[in-house]
Amino acid sequence: MIELGLRNDVYRRPLMTALDRLGLREGWRFADVGAGGGDVSGALAEIVGRDGRVYAIDSDPAARDQVAELAAASAQVVAITQAGEDLLLPEPVDLAFCRFLLLHVHDPLVVLTRMGGAVRPRGWVVVQEPITTAGRVGGVAMSMPEARHPDVGALLPSLARHAGLAVVAAWAEAPAGAGPGPVAEYLAHLTGVDPGDDPVVLPPLVTVVARRPD
């Protein structure tokens, strides 16, 4: 299995499973759409190496530059300031990836369609999005009022198909725990609230692995 340098990422396992499925390797070109803090870009850059290329894409120039600096230690990096709905790359890539992006955009279908158009024929699109209200803290449903589409993960396989992609695999995974540990730490970082000893089931993360048709 591909080993990613994401030791503190409680959602790393479904990403590793997805990358194993598509065979990410040295020399690939990939786009991290909505790259955020850059942990995933940096980890994947280590795999594609100096012969590969990373497109670090974010609507926030500061976040984009942070990602580019992190990934540049391992691969060629092109930093682009773009919203997902406006995604346009200078060349086709082997993989377009996003995680925790579609819940915030205006139109998830437009972003997925753009991602599909950004990859080469038979290229890969990997998307990971939550079903926020399926998460629980002490048995109480979680919410994310600031998100436009907090449960977009539940629609993800259908959205991928409507974007013209061929869905190869789709599944959901939810980290869970009680008391001190990575799950509680992740929730505290996300919300600013320590759950203490309450049982926590984080929002299931739906992963879709899809391909652009020939």
Per-region residue spans from a language model:
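Conserved alpha-helix/loop element of class I SAM-dependent methyltransferases that forms part
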Residues: 9-28, 43
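A short glycine-rich, Lys/Arg-flanked "PGG" loop and its adjoining helix->strand segment in the class I
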Residues: 109-124
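Class I SAM-dependent methyltransferase SAM/SAH-binding core
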Residues: 31, 37-87
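A short acidic, Gly/Pro-enriched loop at the edge of an enzyme's catalytic core
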Residues: 87-96
